[in-house]
Amino acid sequence: MTVLAVVLSGCSGADDGDESQSSREKSTNPGSSAFEPPRLETKATIGNVEGRIAAERRSRVKRDVTEIVDAWLDAAYVAGDFPRTDFDDAFPGFSSGARDDARSDAGLMSNQAIGDRVESVQATKRRLRIDVLATGKKAVGVTARFVLLMDLELDSGSDAERSERVAGSLFMTWRQGGWQVFGYDVKRGLA
């Protein structure tokens, strides 16, 4: 598995228009008690591809990997009710070993360290570049390089409003019928 990680680190929604009137009113009326800013969509691209893979499969890899990364970013940083202290489900799509590591790094890999002080979180940038390792015309590994910028409003103190940047790489492989994060290299700090 170490060899795969080294190789990978070297790699560089549909809208059907059937939205109900009440849901449109909630999403567009700031006076509504159910108002939430629209979710910022992740801008994802395929980066370097080592090996051969058909365009159709590239599109599928892009879609599937973006879903895994989005699920983690939402669960760990930007979605859910705040303030909160429960981040048990913050690592969807992670292997059991990577999930254990991420829980040990919870202040880096989620908002757990400040979750009880967070009043609101708004993502201002979500970017993803997916480098692919393919063999036999199939993607077998990816390095998902991401950037998340978010504005946080905390309950009090000199840092009550601040912008943070979380960026790095998630190393993924195809396991049990889907992409799974087996390792990461992530940094977090003020934006």
PLM regions: where:
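A general secondary-structure boundary signal
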Residues: L8-G10, D64, D88-F91, A167-S169
